[in-house]
């Protein structure tokens, strides 16, 4: 069990009043708040160690480089990668997935297929649309059954034509957690490369990329109590060796001639220019913070909150919840609509009560088209949320329903 009240003291942003109400922050799927440990680590880096990495021999440069590479090792341990060669720092999940799709362009040919699902974030759709457009490959979608991934549909479409499978570990709308280990086995049976968008899973559960046996795994720092502008791409070494750099410039080179150049070894051949040093170090601080709490404890806490709030939400007349009703398949994300009330109006009404939620298509328009809704509201939970926050959400929804009664 988490001591949430102690945890909340580490997040000063939560201690504020919004519209004369205590802030209840339930937009964690969009971004999470940052603990003092992360803020202080970043501040200390800029105050004491700020210098460019891998370049200078002076003490500041050596300290900065040591901290930057120590951060890579922290991430390696956190996701259980086999080597730091397999851990690339990027700007975030979007960048990571774009890099993999660019690699796919080197492999795909006309008649090949890429398999994704209808629940994907745009960052795991558009790069594949582009890769298929450029190569003549076909983008194939797996659809849903009872609010979760239709595994029968996946098995039927997973043929030897499929060269890449790219799926969200957890949906940022439905909250469903996909059986990635099982899907990876199926993908490898037909020789496909398995790519996972881990943006919505890595902050909330223990990740072991070797146990999952995935070929690529992407996630972002800002969704797991870390800073913005930093993310990670894990890739199996054999694929990263084949993969061409996406960006070119300083630091990723071994030697430059007038008409050609050679690249550094992994992982540095992918990290051109001055990297986000403070971001990487801040992300490592976030990982340390989360691991002190315990990833199993974090997952259990969020499951407890969902089990508590879900039936209360179901009891609100006119409220529609999207996704599987099997709570064992769900993460701490709940998308919903209240009657015919537009989600933006609903989110605005909740904000008047101090409750911060997301409203819109959540960068998942194909999913919402499939669900036949233009948008939803979304509440998403994290380590600092409480059952009192759940009660406040339910109370605010009831007040909103009463205020708009008769209009939907």
What is each of the regions a protein language model found here?
Residues 1-408:
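Pyridoxal 5′-phosphate
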């Amino acid at each position: 069990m988490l001591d949430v009240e102690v945890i909340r003291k580490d997040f000063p942003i939560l201690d504020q009043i919004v519209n004369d109400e205590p802030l209840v922050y339930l937009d964690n799927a969009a971004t999470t708040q940052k603990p003092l440990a992360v803020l202080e680590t970043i501040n200390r880096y800029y105050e004491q160690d700020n210098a460019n990495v891998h370049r200078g021999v002076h003490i500041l440069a050596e300290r900065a480089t040591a901290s930057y590479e120590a951060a890579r090792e922290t991430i390696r341990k956190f996701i259980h990668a086999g080597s730091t060669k397999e851990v690339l720092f990027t700007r975030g999940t979007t960048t990571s997935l774009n890099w993999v799709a660019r690699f796919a362009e080197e492999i795909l040919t006309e008649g090949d297929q890429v398999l994704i699902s209808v629940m994907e974030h745009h960052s795991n759709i558009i790069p594949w649309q582009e890769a298929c457009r450029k190569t003549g490959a076909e983008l194939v979608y797996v659809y849903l059954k009872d609010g979760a991934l239709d595994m029968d549909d996946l098995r039927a479409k997973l043929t030897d034509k499929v060269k890449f499978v790219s799926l969200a570990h957890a949906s940022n709308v439905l909250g469903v957690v996909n059986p990635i280990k099982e899907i990876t086995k199926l993908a490898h049976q037909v020789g496909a490369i398995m790519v996972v968008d881990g943006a919505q899973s890595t902050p909330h559960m223990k990740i072991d990329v070797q146990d999952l046996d995935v070929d690529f795994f992407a996630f972002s720092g800002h969704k797991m109590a870390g800073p913005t502008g930093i993310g990670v791409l894990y890739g199996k070494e054999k694929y990263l060796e084949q993969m061409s750099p996406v960006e070119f410039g300083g630091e990723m080179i071994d030697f430059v001639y007038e008409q050609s150049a050679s690249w550094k070894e992994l992982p540095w051949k992918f990290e051109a220019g001055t990297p986000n040093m403070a971001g990487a170090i801040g992300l490592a601080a976030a990982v340390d913070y989360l691991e002190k709490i315990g990833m199993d404890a974090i997952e259990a806490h969020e499951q407890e909150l969902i089990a508590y709030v879900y039936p209360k939400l179901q009891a609100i007349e006119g409220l529609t919840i999207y996704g599987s009703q099997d709570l064992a398949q769900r993460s701490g994300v709940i998308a919903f609509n209240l009657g015919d009330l537009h989600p933006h109006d609903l989110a605005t009404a909740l904000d008047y009560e101090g409750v911060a939620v997301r409203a819109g298509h959540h960068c998942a328009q194909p999913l919402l088209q499939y669900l036949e809704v233009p948008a939803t509201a979304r509440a998403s939970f994290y380590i600092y949320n409480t059952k009192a926050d759940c009660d406040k959400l339910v109370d605010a929804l009831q007040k909103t329903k009463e205020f708009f009664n008769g209009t939907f």
